[in-house]
Every structure is written in C-alpha cells, then in structure tokens.
Amino acid sequence: FFFLMIRRPPRSTLFPYTTLFRSGFDGEGQITSAITYVTSENNPKVYWVTGHGEASESDLSTNFSDAINKNNVEISDLALMTDDIPEDAEELVIMSPTTDFSEDEANKVITYLENGGKLLMFTSYTGTDMPNLDSILENYGVKRSSGIVVETDSQHYYPQMPYYLLPNIQSDDITTEVKSNYILMPVAQAIQKLDSYRDTITIKSLLTTTEDAYIENDPENSTWSKSADSETGAFDLGVSITETVDDKETQIIYFSSASMLSSQIDQAISGANSKLAATALTSMCDVEQTVVIPSKSTSYTNLVFTQGAVNTWSIITIAGIPLVLVVIGVMIWMKRRKQ
C-alpha cells in the first residue's frame, strides 16, 4: 500500500492512496482538508449524544460523514446518563433518538444551551411520546406535531409518496449552497411555534411546506386524503433558533426528519440533504474557514421528478404524443385522398 502524509510539526495526517478514488476522484478534497488540519491550532469538538437508540454517524450517508471529516471536526460519543457535558463541547448532536431522555438528561442539555451552547437536532416519527426530549425544544419556543406532514401540492412531494416531502427552501446562510437543489424529507413532523415564548428567542424557518399541506395524526391507518378536521397550512420542517442573553448566544438547528440523512434518500437527490446537514453542523462550531471540495464523481446524477412532473409527462406520453400522431396521420390521409 502507498500512503500520503501531510505534516507540519507537531501535527500530521496520513491516508492511503486508495481512499482518494471511490466512484470518483477525491484527492483535492482530502489533501486540502489535510493541509487545513496540520495548519490549524485547534479543531472543533462536537459530542454525539448516545444511549437512546440514536443513529450513529456510520448509519448515515457517507456524504455527510465525509463533509464533517473534511472540515476536521472531532466527534466523540456522549452518554448523558452517566456523563456531564464536557466544557470543551462546542456543539451537541442529537440524532433520531427512539426512546425518551430522562428528566436529568434533558436538564443537562437545557443547562448547556442556556450557557451559550449549540445543538444540531434531528428527530424521527416514532408514534410514542417523548416529553423530556420535547422539553428541550419547548424551552426554546417550538414543539413537534404528534403526526406527520402530508403534502397535497403535487409539485412538492416525491411521486406516489405524499409523505416524502420536497419542501420550499428559505433563504439563509445555512441553505445557500442547496438553494438550487431539492431537499427530500421523508415522514417529517411539523415544527410549530408555541403560543408564547421568551422575546429573546428568534425562530427562523429553513424548510417549509406549501399552504396545502396537512398533518396526518394516524399514519399507520391513513388513506392519505385530507379530512374536514385536518390541520392544514404551511408547516416548518427545519428551523434555526437563536437566543442571546448576557453576551451568550445559544443556537439550535432542528430538522424533523432524520431519514433525510439515510444513504438511499440522500443519493436520490445527489447529496443535497447531507450537504445541508453538514453546513448546519459546521456553521455552529469554530471551524476554520476553508474550501470543502467534494469528490469529482464519475457516476451519474439523479434526475428528480415531483408528482406534478410525473403527471405532466404521463399526459404528454399517453395522450399528447398519440394525438399528434393521429392528427398528422389524418392530414396525410386527407391530402392523399384529394390527389
């Protein structure tokens, strides 16, 4: 095996040449990241909360972990049941817990945030209540719906899956790099503002549905049709929350669909989900500004069709084209008949 070393005493990094080539060329990205690593004084430390059935970094799209690694973010596991949040924690990640936090664990997170902490949070619909986990969000002015969001605008959901949402992307520094892409959010819950919260809190929408969306409270038995008593409207699926008190700025970025980071979903939209998530993570910690160069892929790029696009092309191919051919045929027949 051959290895490439980037070294600037006392720091160095080493990786085999085989990692430069996957389904594309990644040499520029890895070398640029390595140079940044050896020339930086410190790398940000992010703690990944465990102990509640959370998804680990290895469970998610490799595009997400690659982007984190290229930013030289150091990630460590943190079991809140037994450990306090370390003083060097620049950010916490809560990734799709399947069981609730204890009250003590939730209070640890809230105390950390009240002292200027940062949190990147993804949740998944489980059908079970998690009051302690939800208390973290409610302390900062938002709650998640008990059901999932269903979209009825055919331009904003994946074909034949109205619960696989293609939300509107709002303008923000976090969303700039994906503004021209689709973001795919499967089985997402609505993020709703509380009726009252502290006036020091600012809640900004990142991803939103159309006004035609509704909340389905019983997705296991749903016919995916809106009823008269369905809660409808434009719902947030991703938000950025900030609060500044006594020169301490708390920041939370929350997305209500952890499935957006699965490899299959991320690949369906050519890595846009992982790019958004990685930008969200690095925006809240002290990452030295550098250019993250993605690998130059030799594979294909997926073409994403909404249900509306599928309907349009179906009409064109099933009715439009045959009709045109019939008209042309009739015109030719009439012309020959006159001759």
Please tell me what each predicted stretch does:
Residues 5-19:
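Residue-level detector of conserved catalytic or cofactor/ligand-binding positions
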Residues 1, 16-339:
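Short, surface-exposed patches at the edges or C-terminal ends of soluble domains, predominantly
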